[in-house]
């Protein structure tokens, strides 16, 4: 740690990290695969964890939401950070089509309040940093028939 950081501040940082490690220990049993440490912030929501694989030292920051229900899973490499308030949603909440999923390479991150709509396959490479509020969608509405509503024409999933 930086020498300019005082003892009290170091204790606070270590205490908060320890809480995240403890949350990770409790939640890792609900995930398909976890290597190394898993750090989980407060109010993180993980659903369908048996479709989620994490490499070494993955961090889910506060208020992030990760849904694993998809055909190819959510696969996060080593040292991946999912920022505060990020949503990863491969499928509809309400029984729509099952999505494909997400793969993130080592040392990559999604900045705060990002949205990953991975109903089609989304692949993020190694050493990639997505900035705050970045949104990726692997789906598009079909809108070729002008006499029909866009909702009634369906979607196509392409990543």
State each model region's role.
Residues 1-37, 43, 79, 127, ...:
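Terminal amphipathic alpha-helical/low-complexity segments used for targeting or macromolecular assembly
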Residues 38-39, 70:
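Extended beta-solenoid/beta-helix repeat architectures
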Residues 49-52, 60-159:
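Flexible, glycine/small-residue-enriched loop-and-beta-strand segment within the central core
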């Amino acid at each position: 740690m930086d020498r300019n950081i005082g003892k009290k501040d170091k204790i606070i940082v270590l205490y908060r990290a320890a809480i995240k490690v403890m949350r990770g220990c409790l939640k890792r049993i609900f995930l398909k695969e976890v290597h190394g440490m898993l750090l989980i912030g407060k109010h993180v929501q993980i659903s369908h964890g048996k479709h989620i694989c994490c490499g070494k030292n993955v961090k889910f920051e506060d208020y992030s939401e990760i849904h694993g229900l998809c055909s190819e899973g959510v696969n996060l490499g080593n040292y991946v950070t999912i920022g505060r308030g990020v949503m990863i949603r491969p499928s509809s909440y309400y029984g729509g089509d099952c999505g494909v999923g997400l793969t993130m390479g080592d040392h990559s991150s999604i900045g705060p309040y990002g949205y990953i709509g991975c109903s089609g396959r989304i692949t993020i490479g190694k050493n990639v940093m997505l900035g705050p509020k970045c949104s990726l969608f692997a789906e598009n509405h079909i809108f070729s028939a002008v006499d029909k509503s866009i909702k009634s024409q369906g979607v196509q999933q392409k990543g």
